[in-house]
Structure formats: C-alpha cells, structure tokens
Amino acid sequence: TVVHPHMPDFLALYPEVDVQMRLEDRYMDLIDDPVDLAIRITNHPPPGLMGRHLMDIDHLLCASPQYLARHGTPVHPLELKAHSCIYLGEEPGDAHWKLRSHGKTVTVAVRGRYAANHTGVRLDAVLQHIGIASLPRFTAREALADGRIVQVLPDWSFLPNYSGQLWILHPPTRHLPLKLRVLMDFLAERLGGVDGLQVQRG
C-alpha cells in the first residue's frame, strides 16, 4: 500500500500511538464501522465526511529492461497488442487500455498470461520480466529510480479505469483527537498533500 512504507517512521516518532491498519476491498462506513480514519481514492469525497487531500494518483506503463531487450520496446500504443500485458483483471474493460497524447486518445485491446488486482503483485510481475504493466506512480517510483524498471510509452498518458485523488477521511467532529491529527499531518507531509487543506462535504 502507499501508506504502509511510512508507518515504521511514524511509530518511531510517536511511540505512544498505536495503529491498527485494515486493508478492505469493501466500502467502509465511517459512521457505523469502528474505524477512525479511512484512506480512499476518489475525486468526490462522500457527503457528510471531513477529509484531507493527500496526493493525486496517476498511472504509467512499466516494464523491466530485460523484458524490453527480449521483446522490443513499443513506440506506439497499438504495438502493445504484440506484448504480454499485465492488467487489473477485475472487469472486462480492464483489458482495454486507453492512452492519450497531444489530444489524441487511443484504445488498445491488450492481452497477457497474467492479471492481478494488486499493484504490488503487478510490480513484482514486472520485476520478474513477465510483461508490461499499468502501475500507480507511487508503486513504481522506487524501482524506476534505481533502474530495475523503465517507463514504457513515456510520451503517452495512461488513462486507467480507476483513478482519482488519495484522501484521508474521518467522520465529522468538532474535536479530532490529537493522535489522529498527528497521523493525518504525517501522511500529508510524506505523501505530498497540501498542508492545512481540510474540506467538509454536505
């Protein structure tokens, strides 16, 4: 996850604060469920909740240098048809990749022998030279920086079916506990959020 890599530092900075993290695919009801904070990807935070914008989520296509050396580097989206593409695999539309460049959008029906709905699994598949994957930039950042993977079609913007902004949300309250405020501030600083940005919907 995008949050977990930063938690050891948070726990070291605030030894008096305990954290229980729950990874759920289902929608968490912050009013009825016993949850203090939720982190969601959305462009529209739900009405009635308060939240803080942490970061924008963008995606890119990546492959290992070894895979590209063996199979060639695509220079146009349509060339992805000839490659092993690692996609989300939850819905039929996940195998149709959309890319945009200079106002032109191209949709490509891709295929591959491996699909995974977890970004960490797709990254590992790329590192194992299985193919070209769509990855959030925050997932790919470290491997890109050290050269283990490279961006494919860098002149094209990948348009995922699921995108948005990363928000940390909590139920409306006049007095947010200090331990929650420090966690929100910490994550906003680490993930590039705008300091002090608080919104209330509804």
Predicted segments with their positions:
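Beta->alpha turn/N-cap motifs
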Residues: D25, I41-N43, S64-P65, L135-F138, ...
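C-terminal effector-binding regulatory domain of bacterial HTH transcription factors
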Residues: R141-E142, D146, D155-G202
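A ligand-binding cleft/hinge motif common to bilobed small-molecule-binding domains
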Residues: A125-I149
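Ligand-binding "clamshell"
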Residues: P46-G51, A143-P154
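Central regulatory/effector-binding core of bacterial HTH transcription factors
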Residues: T1-M50, Q200
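Short beta-strand-to-loop elements that line the ligand-binding cleft
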Residues: V19-L23, V108-H118
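Flexible hinge/capping segments at coil-to-helix
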Residues: G48-H59, A63-L88
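Secondary-structure junction motif
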Residues: S84-G103
